[in-house]
């Protein structure tokens, strides 16, 4: 089972517009430095006509700085591993996230992430690699008071495209015809220090 990224995107766009139009929902002049662990086993990996929703594992981490006006940004790194058509796939992406937070000790955050760098590997005897990745992510977080800061948790939905894949053997370069498309959902759990 996986979430439809297009539907999530529409939902987040609607909520974001409501929040940005309303200036009465400031973040109560609290700055936050947040650290997250990302983990999930839901998703869909597609390579041409071959699709799998089984044995998908995503792990990662994120650091996020939220200013007193509610705007935030930070990097997020994720690695997804699966087996597709008897081939081992490793998909790594480095993303830049931006967000908007409302509330004080109890908070709500909506955010968007964009893939900036990454690497994909396909292994099954031969090894195909790519350093090209594009895609985006949406996330929603809730925060509650906890020891000089906050506990923060929520969901992140990501869609990334890796490719073109190629290998070089005996000076000859071979390229795969189709890219790999990864759609995954992760839990985001972390701690935020208030300042």
What are these model-predicted stretches?
Residues 57-63, 92-96, 136-140, 183-189:
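Hydrophobic, lipid-facing positions within transmembrane beta-strands of outer-membrane proteins
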Residues 146-148, 181-195:
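Outer-membrane beta-barrel "beta-signal"
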Residues 1-32, 195:
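Cleavable N-terminal export/targeting peptides
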Residues 25-85:
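Short glycine/proline- and aromatic-enriched beta-strand/turn motifs that initiate or cap beta-hairpins
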Residues 69-75, 105-110, 146-153, 195:
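Repeated loop/turn-to-beta-strand initiation elements of outer-membrane beta-barrel proteins
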Residues 42-54, 83-91, 118-132, 163-172:
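Outer-membrane beta-barrel translocator domains and adjoining extracellular loop/strand segments
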Residues 32-41, 74-78, 109-113, 152-158, ...:
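Transmembrane beta-strands of outer-membrane beta-barrel proteins
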Residues 80, 111-135, 152-162, 182-185:
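Outer-membrane beta-barrel translocator/channel fold
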